[in-house]
Amino acid sequence: GLGDVYKRQRPDTQLYIMDALERYIHDFSSPEEELLHELDRQTHLQVVQPRMLSGHIQGKLLELLVRMLRPRNILEIGTFTGYSALCMAAGLEEDGVLDTVEVDDELEEFAASFFRRSPHGQKIRQHIGSALDIVPTLGYTFDLVFIDGDKREYPDYYRMLMGDGGSKVLVHSGSILIADNILWSGKIVEPVAHNDRHTQALLEFNRMI
């Protein structure tokens, strides 16, 4: 099959194909908004590990999903610099609320500065700290959850949302759960080192869902 052909290709060929596919998708997508373009650029200039930013294609997909699903309450675990939050907020109806949680307090003002400049920023409630501590206190049942936080905590995020241990269930039967990086650049199908907690946690999370 095509998967076997792809696996037999040299790594540099695989990278070329992935880059070409990304350019192709970009060419057939709506243009990136000016504020988001600036956010992307400033993230690459000022922030460590800028590749963690969702980016234009993923952002447009998230916005589209929000427009289609029409959630009232969205939870994002892992704000980073705020790109994905702004994209989801753009698709959110005016009376909707997006709670976004980031553990790194050094990113708080960076993201907040772009939220303030966006016409959709008033829909966003920004929280700094551990999602496992903050989310249960928010008082919402969430219609849509986007998980893009610490990969080692993905199983704990899921248990929290499902109310394991007798705590309140934070989702309902029609809620949508979106989790980023669950294939982890293919590491989930390779031998896993005993100290690779990120991949181990993602494997556990994938089995749970």
Please give the residue ranges for each predicted region.
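Short, small-residue-biased leader/transition segments that mark boundaries at the very start
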Residues: 1-6
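Class I SAM-dependent transferase core
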Residues: 8-75
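S-adenosylmethionine/decaboxylated-SAM
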Residues: 56-208
